[in-house]
Amino acid sequence: MAHFPGFGQSLLFGYPVYVFGDCVQGDWCPISGGLCSARLHRHALLATCPEHQITWDPIDGRVIGSALQFLIPRLPSFPTQRTSKTLKVLTPPTTHTTPNIPPSFLQAMRKYSPFRNGYMEPTLGQHLPTLSFPDPGLRPQNLYTLWGGSVVCMYLYQLSPPITWPLLPHVIFDHPDQLGAFLTNVPYKRMEELLYKISLTTGALIILPEDCLPTTLFQPARAPVTLTAWQSGLLPFHSTLTTPGLIWAFTDGTPMISGPCPKDGRPSLVLQSSSFIFHKFQTKAYHPSFLLSHGLIQYSSFHNLHLLFEEYTNIPISLLFNEKEADDTDHEPQVSPGGLEPPSEKHFRETEV
């Protein structure tokens, strides 16, 4: 898993931030209220303090007695956790427990797929720009998971206490067999624990494949998954995008939509933006962290994330691309009269974004 150095405190609560699955040499001890030990560490979604012999859950701050109680929800055990500063951290926002999913959303999920040769390439992270952050408190970790013929993004920013919960969608599609981009080979047990915590804390509706985690402790919704593979290496370009996903808000109010690749040879797991980006970088595909580091989107704008439902399925091409690039004929494999083959998988891997 990727490890991003320079861990810092959160911009909102002064709370430490984490990257899912990594070991962080520093955390707040619930007893002392500070960094009481240099040996303090976090691993496998747990944090321990060797000086005070205490173990707690860094995601929601709940103190636990042993790893066996990891999935048991409980109130904070120490008065130091109930201060005015930590109370805001330990209190998740209210969410809808039973969000309504329009049938059109589930139907639209089957339209496009970022499969390459029948499976998700684990090297898709190489196609994205280098992660750069203006502040150490913002550490996005995106779980790109495939659902049927489409990609669904679980935007799990930091996975550190509840400053992340407003950023989570109310409906989470998770296919543990098809994790890609930044996180790969996540153990089923860890994913189950994470989804269970999200379900408890936020009330989000977890949707899993019918044959995934059959003995899970919580009761997720089940939905069939039909896997289909694209013959070409990348998603085709379309003049009118019909892509379920998330809508972001730029600092100037223009939208940024997650969708398939804009041009042949460009990465598919990126975010497409409006004309606001063209004036800055003459491009349409950049990772949210890159846009964040250049001041194009704000941290507060992440709270405007919402699921892309029926009213957003048809997006005019003028909102996303320049007129000269509004060409939907370049997604077909181009074979010259000499019989040359189209670009191979190695070509895509070496293409600069």
UniProtKB/Swiss-Prot annotation:
A zinc finger (unnamed) spans 23-49. GO terms for molecular function: DNA binding; SH3 domain binding; zinc ion binding. Phosphorylation at Thr-48 results in the loss of NF-kappa-B activation function. Phosphorylation at Thr-215 results in loss of CREB and NF-B responsive promoters activation. Phosphorylation at Thr-184 and Ser-336 have no effect on these Tax functions. Phosphorylation of either Ser-300 or Ser-301 is necessary for localization to nuclear bodies. Thr-48, Thr-184, Thr-215 and Ser-336 are highly phosphorylated, whereas Ser-300 or Ser-301 are only rarely phosphorylated. GO terms for biological process: positive regulation of DNA-templated transcription; symbiont-mediated activation of host NF-kappaB cascade; symbiont-mediated perturbation of host cell cycle G0/G1 transition checkpoint; symbiont-mediated perturbation of host cell cycle G1/S transition checkpoint; symbiont-mediated perturbation of host exit from mitosis. Residues 343-353 have a biased composition (Basic and acidic residues). The modification Phosphothreonine is found at residues 48, 184, 215. The modification Phosphoserine is found at residues 300-301, 336. Residues 106-111 are annotated as: Interaction with IKBKG. Coiled coil: none annotated. Residues 116-145, 213-248 are annotated as: Homodimerization. Residues 326-353 are annotated as: Disordered. A motif (Nuclear export signal) lies at residues 188-202. GO terms for cellular component: host cell cytoplasm; host cell nucleus. The 48 N-terminal residues contain a non-canonical functional nuclear localization signal (NLS). The PDZ-binding domain mediates binding to human DLG1 and MAGI3. Interaction with other PDZ domain-containing protein induces IL2-independent growth. HTLV-1 lineages are divided in four clades, A (Cosmopolitan), B (Central African group), C (Melanesian group) and D (New Central African group). Transcriptional activator that governs the viral transcription from the 5'LTR via the recruitment of dimers of host phosphorylated CREB1. Together they bind cAMP response elements within the viral promoter and mediate high-level viral transcription. Increases host CREB1 O-GlcNAcylation to further increase 5'LTR transactivation. Also modulates the expression of cellular genes leading to the deregulation of T-cell proliferation, perturbing the integrity of cell cycle checkpoints, the DNA damage response and apopototic pathways. This is Protein Tax-1. The gene is tax.
